């Protein structure tokens, strides 16, 4: 009877807490289960532990793939997996809900977004600034922080192109038995963050003279994401946009403090993120935050495993100067379209209220030109929508990509990154072989004008190298990854994995 009364009091207390904090129903249910000694697993069962031993399964599976020839043995990959395997064990019973529960009394910024929106809806004055004069409240918050459970450290895995980072991420993510996990491409994640920020700002009352208050939506957005997931896996963590660079520290500090575990892969070590970027000094503190909450693992094996001998899927890359190259691509489109239950027609995709027109499609096949995809003002969100609608995309008239074509080169790199991540099959008709598609030679007219401007400003060569606007370091670095990925996308294994007709 005493045990029953204790459980009843616990449930009443939790209901009172959630009435005040207004966390989501999903979060409330998970905390109630946790209070009864249960843990939620990805299979939907509730038990005191995972239904099978997790430790040992990940590396054993990797060893079996090596044994049967699916993967090539690599000591650095195995060492990284040993570390990730321990994290899979910890994450099985991990939840960040207890970290989200304590609410500071003096700072609306740390309240869930739903309560913030309720206050906005009632036209109450919103003030998220901590009172500087209330030192005692700050001490109380520090005590609350120290009493919170500490989340496990995440991982930041970096290395050259083709060293197996994405493969390790695939293995790790598939073996994590926690249904509150999420895997996203970094570009797509940041697009979603900016959408959330915009939506939150739009929900605020109009500013009036004399009633203006400072408001920063980044932390509420971080809390909103933390309510949805306790593990985020990022593939291709890269920072090239100043709008992203300026909010990363605050965003990720919020995620980490809300108990979100981050596992990321990147081609760059943390110190080289946003290298030569505009206003990089404001970005540098993020590197310290990343190192505090994530273990850094190098995977520089010096081997591009994507270029190893793999059975090709047939001819998928054509050079426009070759005889009958265009006819061959036309024939391939007709062959693929014949299997579709559709007619060849233009198609208009709606992306965030904008229209993206593709002139020639048939079912899940899109026949596009480089001009359609990379010379229009398109971004990662547009390419993700194309990847969602089509499993095979033909890209025609891909030119020599000169260093002066920064916008086109960046869009092309983003396009291939998103297609690769979504297993979209690509057929290309280009002006140059794949390994020579990026022309790093002759200076273009745009670059010549930039150089003249630098001379007129009296900037030294050393100073000019630090100005990302006039350099192509990021484009060259990113394009190496693009070439490696396109090489893998021409293999039979990739082509079969991208076929959605069987799904």
From Swiss-Prot:
Which GO terms are recorded in the biological process aspect for this UniProt protein?
Answer: cilium movement
Q: Where does ATP bind?
A: 159-166
Keyword Nucleotide-binding set for record:
yes
Q: Where is the composition biased (Basic and acidic residues)?
A: 130-148
One annotated GO molecular function: ATP binding
**Highest taxon of source:** Eukaryota
Q: Which parts of the sequence are annotated with region: Disordered?
A: 108-155
Annotated Gene Ontology cellular component terms:
cytoplasm; mitochondrion; nucleus
Q: Which InterPro entries match?
A: ATPase_AFG1-like, P-loop_NTPase
Provide this UniProt record's keywords sorted from A to Z. ATP-binding, Nucleotide-binding
Statement: the UniProt record of this protein carries the keyword ATP-binding: yes
Per the record, the similarity remark reads: Belongs to the AFG1 ATPase family.
Protein name, per record:
Lactation elevated protein 1 homolog B
Could you tell me which species this protein originates from? Danio rerio
């Amino acid at each position: 009877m005493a045990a029953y009364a204790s459980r009843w009091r616990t449930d009443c207390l939790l209901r009172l807490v959630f009435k005040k904090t207004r966390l989501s129903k999903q979060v409330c249910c998970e905390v109630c289960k946790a209070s009864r000694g249960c843990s939620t697993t990805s299979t939907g069962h509730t038990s005191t532990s995972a239904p099978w031993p997790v430790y040992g399964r990940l590396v054993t599976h990797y060893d079996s793939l090596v044994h049967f020839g699916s993967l090539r043995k690599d000591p650095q990959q195995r060492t990284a997996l040993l570390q990730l395997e321990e994290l899979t064990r910890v994450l099985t019973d991990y939840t960040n809900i207890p970290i989200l529960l304590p609410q500071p009394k003096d700072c609306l910024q740390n309240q869930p977004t739903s309560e913030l929106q309720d206050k906005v809806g009632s036209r109450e004055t919103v003030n998220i600034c901590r009172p500087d004069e209330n030192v005692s409240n700050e001490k109380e918050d520090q005590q609350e922080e120290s009493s919170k459970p500490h989340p496990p450290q995440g991982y930041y895995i970096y290395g050259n192109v083709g060293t197996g980072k994405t493969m390790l991420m695939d293995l790790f993510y598939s073996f994590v038995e926690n249904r509150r996990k999420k895997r996203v491409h970094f570009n797509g994640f940041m697009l979603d963050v900016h959408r959330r920020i915009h939506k939150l700002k739009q929900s605020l009352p109009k500013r009036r003279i004399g009633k203006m208050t400072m408001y920063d939506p980044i932390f509420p957005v971080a809390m909103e994401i933390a309510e949805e997931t306790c593990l985020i896996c990022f593939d291709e963590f890269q920072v090239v946009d100043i709008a992203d660079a300026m909010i990363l520290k605050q965003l990720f500090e919020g995620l980490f403090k809300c108990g979100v575990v981050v596992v990321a892969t990147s081609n760059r070590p943390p110190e080289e993120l946003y290298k030569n970027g505009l206003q990089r000094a404001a970005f540098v503190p993020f590197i310290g935050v990343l190192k505090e909450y994530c273990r850094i693992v190098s995977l520089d094996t010096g081997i591009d495993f994507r270029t190893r001998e793999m059975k090709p899927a047939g001819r998928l890359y054509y050079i426009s100067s070759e005889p009958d190259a265009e006819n061959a691509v036309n024939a391939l489109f007709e062959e693929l379209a014949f299997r579709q239950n559709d007619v060849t027609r233009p198609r208009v995709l709606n992306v965030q209220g904008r229209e993206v027109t593709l002139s020639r499609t048939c079912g899940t096949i899109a026949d596009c030109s480089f001009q359609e995809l990379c010379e229009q003002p398109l971004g990662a969100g547009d390419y993700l929508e194309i990847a969602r609608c089509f499993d095979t995309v033909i890209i025609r008239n891909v030119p020599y990509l000169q260093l002066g074509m920064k916008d086109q080169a960046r869009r092309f790199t983003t396009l291939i990154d998103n297609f690769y991540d979504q297993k979209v099959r690509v057929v290309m008709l280009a002006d140059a072989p794949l390994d020579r598609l990026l022309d790093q030679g002759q200076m273009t007219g745009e670059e010549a004008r930039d150089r003249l401007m630098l001379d007129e400003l009296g900037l030294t060569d050393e100073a000019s190298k630090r100005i990302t606007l006039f350099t192509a370091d990021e484009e060259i670095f990113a394009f190496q990854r693009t070439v490696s990925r396109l090489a893998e996308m021409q293999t039979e294994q990739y082509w079969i994995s991208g076929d959605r007709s069987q799904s």
